[in-house]
Protein backbone atom coordinates (compact mmCIF):
# COMPACT_ATOMS: atom_id res chain seq x y z
CA UNK A 1 0.00 0.00 0.00
CA UNK A 2 1.10 3.54 -0.74
CA UNK A 3 1.26 4.66 2.86
CA UNK A 4 3.76 1.91 3.68
CA UNK A 5 6.34 3.75 1.60
CA UNK A 6 9.17 5.25 3.64
CA UNK A 7 11.03 8.51 3.18
CA UNK A 8 13.98 6.41 2.07
CA UNK A 9 11.90 4.81 -0.68
CA UNK A 10 10.76 8.11 -2.16
CA UNK A 11 13.77 10.36 -1.44
CA UNK A 12 16.76 8.10 -2.17
CA UNK A 13 16.90 9.25 -5.79
CA UNK A 14 16.46 12.93 -4.89
CA UNK A 15 19.35 12.69 -2.44
CA UNK A 16 21.64 11.69 -5.33
CA UNK A 17 20.77 14.77 -7.39
CA UNK A 18 23.72 17.12 -7.97
CA UNK A 19 21.93 20.11 -6.39
CA UNK A 20 21.31 18.15 -3.17
CA UNK A 21 24.88 16.87 -2.94
CA UNK A 22 26.06 20.46 -3.49
CA UNK A 23 23.82 21.67 -0.67
CA UNK A 24 25.24 19.09 1.74
CA UNK A 25 28.78 19.88 0.61
CA UNK A 26 28.33 23.62 1.12
CA UNK A 27 26.96 23.11 4.63
CA UNK A 28 29.76 20.65 5.47
CA UNK A 29 32.41 23.06 4.15
CA UNK A 30 31.04 25.92 6.23
CA UNK A 31 31.04 23.75 9.35
CA UNK A 32 34.61 22.62 8.65
CA UNK A 33 35.76 26.22 8.21
CA UNK A 34 34.53 27.04 11.71
CA UNK A 35 31.17 28.65 10.89
CA UNK A 36 28.49 27.72 13.44
CA UNK A 37 25.55 26.17 11.63
CA UNK A 38 22.22 25.27 13.23
CA UNK A 39 20.89 22.73 13.84
CA UNK A 40 23.79 20.35 14.60
CA UNK A 41 24.49 17.95 11.74
CA UNK A 42 22.89 14.97 13.52
CA UNK A 43 19.60 16.88 13.83
CA UNK A 44 19.20 18.33 10.31
CA UNK A 45 16.78 15.60 9.16
CA UNK A 46 14.95 15.01 12.46
CA UNK A 47 11.57 15.94 10.97
CA UNK A 48 11.84 12.84 8.78
CA UNK A 49 13.28 10.69 11.57
CA UNK A 50 10.42 11.38 13.97
CA UNK A 51 7.57 11.33 11.41
CA UNK A 52 7.75 8.57 8.80
CA UNK A 53 6.03 9.20 5.45
CA UNK A 54 3.34 6.60 6.11
CA UNK A 55 2.51 8.22 9.47
CA UNK A 56 2.07 11.82 8.27
CA UNK A 57 -1.34 13.19 9.29
CA UNK A 58 -0.61 16.91 9.58
CA UNK A 59 2.08 19.08 7.97
CA UNK A 60 3.13 22.37 9.57
CA UNK A 61 5.56 24.34 7.40
CA UNK A 62 8.15 26.61 8.97
CA UNK A 63 10.70 28.73 7.15
CA UNK A 64 14.29 28.28 8.30
CA UNK A 65 15.67 27.00 11.62
CA UNK A 66 16.03 29.18 14.70
CA UNK A 67 19.46 30.80 14.59
CA UNK A 68 20.15 31.24 18.32
CA UNK A 69 22.37 28.95 20.43
CA UNK A 70 20.80 25.61 21.34
CA UNK A 71 17.39 26.34 19.82
CA UNK A 72 17.10 24.46 16.52
CA UNK A 73 16.96 20.66 16.54
CA UNK A 74 15.37 19.85 13.20
CA UNK A 75 11.66 20.28 13.97
CA UNK A 76 9.97 23.48 12.78
CA UNK A 77 8.86 25.83 15.60
CA UNK A 78 10.24 23.46 18.27
CA UNK A 79 13.16 24.14 20.64
CA UNK A 80 15.08 21.81 22.91
CA UNK A 81 13.99 21.36 26.54
CA UNK A 82 15.52 24.06 28.74
CA UNK A 83 15.48 26.69 25.96
CA UNK A 84 13.04 29.60 26.29
CA UNK A 85 9.90 29.13 24.19
CA UNK A 86 10.16 31.46 21.15
CA UNK A 87 7.46 34.10 20.46
CA UNK A 88 5.80 32.33 17.50
CA UNK A 89 5.43 29.11 19.49
CA UNK A 90 4.08 31.06 22.48
CA UNK A 91 1.40 32.41 20.15
CA UNK A 92 0.65 28.87 18.96
CA UNK A 93 0.22 27.88 22.61
CA UNK A 94 -2.06 30.89 23.12
CA UNK A 95 -4.27 29.77 20.22
CA UNK A 96 -4.32 26.24 21.67
CA UNK A 97 -5.30 27.60 25.11
CA UNK A 98 -8.14 29.55 23.53
CA UNK A 99 -9.52 26.67 21.46
CA UNK A 100 -8.64 23.28 22.99
CA UNK A 101 -10.51 22.58 26.26
CA UNK A 102 -8.09 21.76 29.07
CA UNK A 103 -4.96 22.84 27.20
CA UNK A 104 -2.48 24.48 29.54
CA UNK A 105 0.65 26.15 28.23
CA UNK A 106 3.67 23.91 28.87
CA UNK A 107 6.86 25.31 30.38
CA UNK A 108 8.90 24.15 27.38
CA UNK A 109 8.85 24.38 23.60
CA UNK A 110 9.80 20.82 22.69
CA UNK A 111 7.38 19.41 20.10
CA UNK A 112 8.71 15.88 19.58
CA UNK A 113 5.44 14.45 20.94
CA UNK A 114 3.60 16.16 18.06
CA UNK A 115 6.04 14.69 15.54
CA UNK A 116 5.66 11.20 17.01
CA UNK A 117 1.89 11.43 16.45
CA UNK A 118 2.22 12.23 12.76
CA UNK A 119 2.72 16.01 12.68
CA UNK A 120 5.51 16.69 10.17
CA UNK A 121 7.20 19.86 11.46
CA UNK A 122 9.02 20.80 8.27
CA UNK A 123 11.17 23.86 7.79
CA UNK A 124 11.48 24.71 4.10
CA UNK A 125 15.20 25.46 4.61
CA UNK A 126 16.98 22.95 6.85
CA UNK A 127 20.09 24.84 8.01
CA UNK A 128 21.10 28.39 8.96
CA UNK A 129 24.25 30.25 10.04
CA UNK A 130 24.29 31.32 13.68
CA UNK A 131 22.67 34.72 14.10
CA UNK A 132 21.88 35.12 10.38
CA UNK A 133 18.25 34.43 9.47
CA UNK A 134 17.74 33.09 5.93
CA UNK A 135 21.51 32.77 5.40
CA UNK A 136 21.05 29.34 3.76
CA UNK A 137 17.86 30.20 1.88
CA UNK A 138 19.47 29.86 -1.55
CA UNK A 139 21.52 26.69 -0.98
CA UNK A 140 19.06 24.26 -2.57
CA UNK A 141 17.06 23.22 0.48
CA UNK A 142 13.92 24.80 -1.00
CA UNK A 143 14.15 22.49 -4.03
CA UNK A 144 14.43 19.50 -1.71
CA UNK A 145 11.50 20.48 0.51
CA UNK A 146 9.37 21.29 -2.56
CA UNK A 147 10.00 17.69 -3.56
CA UNK A 148 9.03 16.49 -0.08
CA UNK A 149 5.71 18.35 -0.27
CA UNK A 150 5.01 16.98 -3.75
CA UNK A 151 5.73 13.44 -2.52
CA UNK A 152 3.32 13.79 0.40
CA UNK A 153 0.77 15.20 -2.03
CA UNK A 154 1.29 12.26 -4.36
CA UNK A 155 1.66 9.30 -2.00
CA UNK A 156 -0.67 10.18 0.87
CA UNK A 157 -4.34 11.09 1.12
CA UNK A 158 -6.26 13.22 3.59
CA UNK A 159 -3.27 15.02 5.09
CA UNK A 160 -3.98 18.34 6.82
CA UNK A 161 -1.62 21.12 5.71
CA UNK A 162 -1.41 24.10 8.08
CA UNK A 163 0.00 26.95 5.99
CA UNK A 164 0.78 30.01 8.08
CA UNK A 165 2.06 33.12 6.32
CA UNK A 166 2.73 33.88 2.67
CA UNK A 167 5.93 31.81 2.45
CA UNK A 168 4.20 28.60 3.55
CA UNK A 169 1.18 29.36 1.39
CA UNK A 170 3.32 29.80 -1.75
CA UNK A 171 5.14 26.60 -0.90
CA UNK A 172 1.82 24.78 -0.54
CA UNK A 173 0.36 25.98 -3.83
CA UNK A 174 1.03 22.57 -5.44
CA UNK A 175 -1.12 20.64 -2.94
CA UNK A 176 -4.17 18.92 -4.44
CA UNK A 177 -7.07 20.25 -2.37
CA UNK A 178 -9.28 17.38 -3.57
CA UNK A 179 -6.97 14.86 -1.87
CA UNK A 180 -5.86 16.89 1.13
CA UNK A 181 -7.20 19.46 3.59
CA UNK A 182 -5.45 22.85 3.34
CA UNK A 183 -5.91 25.46 6.08
CA UNK A 184 -4.38 28.94 5.71
CA UNK A 185 -3.80 31.75 8.21
CA UNK A 186 -1.30 34.53 8.92
CA UNK A 187 1.96 33.49 10.58
CA UNK A 188 1.94 33.11 14.40
CA UNK A 189 4.83 35.59 14.66
CA UNK A 190 4.09 38.57 16.94
CA UNK A 191 4.21 40.71 13.78
CA UNK A 192 1.19 39.00 12.22
CA UNK A 193 -0.61 36.76 14.74
CA UNK A 194 -3.23 39.43 15.46
CA UNK A 195 -4.14 39.61 11.76
CA UNK A 196 -5.95 36.28 11.88
CA UNK A 197 -3.73 33.58 13.34
CA UNK A 198 -5.47 34.06 16.67
CA UNK A 199 -8.93 32.65 16.17
CA UNK A 200 -8.03 30.58 13.08
CA UNK A 201 -9.01 27.44 15.05
CA UNK A 202 -6.62 25.33 12.97
CA UNK A 203 -5.72 22.88 15.72
CA UNK A 204 -9.39 22.07 16.32
CA UNK A 205 -10.21 21.93 12.60
CA UNK A 206 -7.28 19.59 11.94
CA UNK A 207 -8.52 17.16 14.58
CA UNK A 208 -12.10 17.35 13.32
CA UNK A 209 -10.85 16.46 9.83
CA UNK A 210 -8.83 13.51 11.16
CA UNK A 211 -11.76 12.23 13.21
CA UNK A 212 -14.07 12.45 10.19
CA UNK A 213 -11.59 10.18 8.40
CA UNK A 214 -11.63 7.71 11.28
CA UNK A 215 -8.12 8.64 12.40
CA UNK A 216 -6.89 9.35 15.91
CA UNK A 217 -6.79 13.11 16.55
CA UNK A 218 -3.59 14.82 17.64
CA UNK A 219 -3.01 15.42 21.34
CA UNK A 220 -1.69 18.97 21.02
CA UNK A 221 -0.33 19.10 24.59
CA UNK A 222 3.46 18.88 24.09
CA UNK A 223 4.96 16.26 26.38
CA UNK A 224 8.63 15.86 27.19
CA UNK A 225 9.92 12.34 26.40
CA UNK A 226 10.44 11.38 30.06
CA UNK A 227 6.86 12.41 30.89
CA UNK A 228 5.35 10.25 28.18
CA UNK A 229 6.92 6.95 29.24
Swiss-Prot record:
Q: Which SMART domains match?
A: UDG (SM00986), UreE_C (SM00987)
The EC designation for this entry is 3.2.2.27
Q: Which CDD domains match?
A: UDG-F1-like (cd10027)
Subcellular localization(s) per the UniProt record: Cytoplasm
Q: Does the keyword Cell membrane apply?
A: no
Reaction(s) this enzyme catalyzes, per UniProt: Hydrolyzes single-stranded DNA or mismatched double-stranded DNA and polynucleotides, releasing free uracil
**Domain of life here?**
Bacteria
Q: What is the annotated signal peptide range for this record?
A: none
Q: Which residues form the active site?
A: 64 (proton acceptor)
Record-annotated disulphide pairs: none
Q: Which UniProt keywords apply?
A: Cytoplasm, DNA damage, DNA repair, Hydrolase
Outline what the protein does.
Excises uracil residues from the DNA which can arise as a result of misincorporation of dUMP residues by DNA polymerase or due to deamination of cytosine.
Matching entries from PANTHER family are given as: URACIL-DNA GLYCOSYLASE (PTHR11264:SF0)
Family from the record: Belongs to the uracil-DNA glycosylase (UDG) superfamily. UNG family.
Descriptive protein name: Uracil-DNA glycosylase
Amino acid sequence: MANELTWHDVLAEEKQQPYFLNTLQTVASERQSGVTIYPPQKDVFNAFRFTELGDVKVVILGQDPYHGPGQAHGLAFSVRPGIATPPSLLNMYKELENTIPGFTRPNHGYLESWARQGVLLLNTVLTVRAGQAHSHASLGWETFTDKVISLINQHREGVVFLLWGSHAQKKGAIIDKQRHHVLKAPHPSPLSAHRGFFGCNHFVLANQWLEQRGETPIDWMPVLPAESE
